[in-house]
């Protein structure tokens, strides 16, 4: 990418920049979320409700693996955007090499540890004797391909930060499209069940990594692979991991919450309650991924203008991103309140499961119209290197609010004569509401400082 293209982040209108940088991310994230939904749809209809529950149990383990990729990828890409704003291209190239080296190292460690303790981990995450076989079969394949997964996400983040959001989008769409083609072949034609779904995921990521590598092997790029950069640098590693710590902790906290939630659901509602959460969460994830696409578009704009000391442009990019995210999550809220049965039937034809899922889905989605704001706010702080505040916002919702509510509300509901499972469901929207209030207080104070 040329210097002129990098500089556009500080000169072009915020609206056009956000459209240019966010739209590829939105398309890519929408495609990725569709892949996650299609994966669950094939498993739900092709294998059964218990397999769907097993996949829900495995999801926090997958998210933990992804969290370590986020620790490197998001942190390094934010640092690259800042370095580009400072015109420090040599450091930006060193960061690129460190992304590869760190992802290989962390990916290998997680693979070995995960495979060795796979069943105990899955039982701790909420698996039952009926669902453990499905969760094990799926995660075993995913873990063998964990290094590829880490590199895939790391390079995808770097592509967006160096001004190639479209190529990042194409790489993601390629992975998604290939996965959607391979899923029915492996699950139905070859009768591989959940193993087939996992194998399709890894194969599609391998192909996308090859595409990403081709871009970074081009010497005409300002940021590219070349000799002299292939060494771990302590300063880059610590800085990148420090910036990436916020989204990492957010992902880890979310994983821990799902683990606690799965166990509470299994305790009060059984495997079918876990399946209910899994279906609703996958549908909610579709819209959340669109917001993540907006975050991806905002990140290089905010990071560059912060590094270039163009605070007014930075603030305008943040506000426009919040507006867009709120509109997206508002659509989810309308869908969840008006017709939850519609999306539930996408995942299963089990009439008992469908009937028991409608009311919990409405509860979980009842305040979704407001949740885009804290999502954008946390990413904003990550983009400008203020990791501590991003960490605070993510941990207040996930740890300070949600976990105590998940544990205490079922007991309270039981005391007043209601089924305790409803306390688990209501913990989610209450925590979301508190997180919106907290984010508003924090960002309001800092916006006054930035304007001054």
Language-model features: locations:
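N-terminal transmembrane alpha-helices
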Residues: 9-47, 60-75, 79, 83, ...
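Short alpha-helical transmembrane segments in multi-pass integral membrane proteins
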Residues: 1-22, 80-147, 191-245, 302-367, ...
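Transmembrane helical elements of multi-pass membrane transporters/channels
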Residues: 20-39, 141, 175, 204-208, ...
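Small-residue hotspots at the loop-to-helix junctions and early N-terminal turns
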Residues: 49-60, 139, 198, 271-286, ...
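Helix-terminus/linker motif at the lipid-water interface of multi-pass membrane proteins
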Residues: 34-53, 122-129, 185-192, 255-282, ...
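Small-residue-rich hydrophobic transmembrane alpha-helices
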Residues: 52-112, 149-168, 276-340, 371-390
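Hydrophobic transmembrane alpha-helices of multi-pass small-molecule transporters
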Residues: 64-67, 179-184, 209-213, 285-289, ...
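Short runs within selected transmembrane alpha-helices of multi-pass transporters and secretion channels
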Residues: 142-160, 168-176, 197-210, 291-295, ...
